[in-house]
Every structure is written in structure tokens, then in C-alpha cells.
Amino acid sequence: MAAPGEALTSSGYIAHHLSNLSLYKLGLVGSETSFWNVHIDSLFFSWFTGLIFLGIFYKVAKRTTAGVPGKLQCAVEMIVEFVADNVKDTFHGRNPLIAPLALTIFCWVFLMNVMDLVPIDFLPYPAEHWLGIPYLKVVPSADVNITMAMALGVFALMIYYSIKVKGLGGFAKELALHPFNHPLMIPFNLLIEVVSLLAKPLSLGMRLFGNMFAGEVVFILCAAMLPWYLQWMGSLPWAIFHILVITIQAFVFMMLTIVYLSMAHEDPDH
């Protein structure tokens, strides 16, 4: 590690910071590819950021006044209006749950992404040397397990609302008779539609993971090339640019969720 007294090489430093605190690393499961190899740090920081989101909005909701709002209330109201406008413009069905879901996704993903702005060794170094925690990754959205879990949650909602709105027969008809409405084309239609359907959660989760993982690697490379007390010099320019990236990625995840759920509510005959 780049901190004083640490013997890790640059490659060792990078590998160390790309390793999750998992049950396998703690010797609690026998294989790193085991289904039960839970990434403890990713789960902790995803719950942590989720609680921050709930705490902020609960505080604002409890203290909302009809008079002059405070700065925090103004910020929250701007976010709520921003999300509500996007839902109104994009979602063409009727479902009162879509706007709260979109708001939760945007804020939660944004807060998880913001963890990428925490200096590389700010939490892992004291965790290792003071608490004995050997590995610690603080960016949940740079863990493919987290992003794909969220994407699969969206996928489950897509299937649920497709069947609820269109009926099981209508959903099957949509898969079998689109884009070519002819019985002989059913196998071809099914191939296209099933691949397209499965590609939605895959692209949704992997897009967020890929962008955030790449950003994390850049921060780690900047830190690996400099001593610990100069790491901020290499990371600051990228951090300023990365503020835009983390916001855009949260927005894209939210918008694609709205679009996919809007498609699930559409009548296939129109």
C-alpha cells in the first residue's frame, strides 16, 4: 500500500483494493465462486447509503412547512419534481408506484455512486490497521452482484406488470407474434423477443457496473502512483469529472427503469 510502512507493490496495492470483504476471504465458504460467497462490504455500504436516503427524506417530510423552506427541503423538492417530471413524460400507463420507485432508484444509485468520491485509503486503511478488516470496497455499484441484483429486481417488475396488465395470454402473444404477425414466424419472433427481454436486465446492470468499476480503477491507479499524502493531487481532477459520471449513471438507470416498466404497461395491439 502507498501508506507508510506498507510493503505492497503497485500491482499488489491495486489487487488489494479491488478485492471485496467476502465470506470466502474470511474462510467461511470453500469456494470464491460459491453462491453463498456474500460480499459483506458491498451489502453493508448499500444498506448504509439506503439508510442515508431514508433518513434524509424522513427528516424533510417530518419538518416540511408551508412557509419559507430550508435548503435541505428545497433540494429534496427539486429532486422529487425532477423525477416526477421524467416519470410524467416517459411513463404512459397508470401506476402510482412508478414515481416513488424511480425516486428511490435515482437517489439510492446516486448515493452508492458517490461513495466512489471517498479517497481510496480513507476507509480501507483504518479498517485494516485499526479494526483488522483485511479488505474493504466502499462502492457498492462497482460490485456486479449489487448492480445485477437491482437490474433483476427491475426485470421481475417488468414480467409482473406485463402479465398483470396484458394477462398471461397477452404477454405470450406479445412474445410470439411480434414483430412479425404470422404463425410461421413464431419461432423467429420468440427468439428475437426472448433475447431482447433478457438483454434488458443484463445491459441495465452491466452498464452501471462497468462505468463505476472503471471509475474506481482510475482512482486506484492514481493512488498507486503516488504516496498516500499526495494521492489527492492525482485523484482530484478525475473526481471533479466523475461527479458528472455518477449523476448520469444514476439518471440512466432510473430512466431505463421507467422506460422498461412503461413498455410493460403498453397494450401490444396499439
From Swiss-Prot:
Disulfide bonds: none
Pfam families: ATP-synt_A
Single GO molecular function: proton-transporting ATP synthase activity, rotational mechanism
Membrane topology: Multi-pass membrane protein
GO BP annotations listed: proton motive force-driven plasma membrane ATP synthesis
GO cellular component: plasma membrane; proton-transporting ATP synthase complex
Stored InterPro entries: ATP_syn_F0_a_bact/chloroplast, ATP_synth_F0_asu, ATP_synth_F0_asu_AS, F0_ATP_A_sf
Membrane-crossing segments per the record: 38-58, 98-118, 143-163, 208-228, 239-259
CDD domains referenced in this protein's UniProt entry, alphabetically: ATP-synt_Fo_a_6
Key word Transmembrane present: yes
Assigned keywords, A-Z: ATP synthesis, Cell inner membrane, Cell membrane, CF(0), Hydrogen ion transport, Ion transport, Membrane, Transmembrane, Transmembrane helix, Transport
Cell compartments where the protein resides: Cell inner membrane
Family: Belongs to the ATPase A chain family.
Description of how the protein assembles with itself and partners: F-type ATPases have 2 components, CF(1) - the catalytic core - and CF(0) - the membrane proton channel. CF(1) has five subunits: alpha(3), beta(3), gamma(1), delta(1), epsilon(1). CF(0) has three main subunits: a(1), b(2) and c(9-12). The alpha and beta chains form an alternating ring which encloses part of the gamma chain. CF(1) is attached to CF(0) by a central stalk formed by the gamma and epsilon chains, while a peripheral stalk is formed by the delta and b chains.
Function noted in UniProt: Key component of the proton channel; it plays a direct role in the translocation of protons across the membrane.
Protein name from the UniProt record: ATP synthase subunit a
Species per Swiss-Prot/TrEMBL record: Vibrio alginolyticus
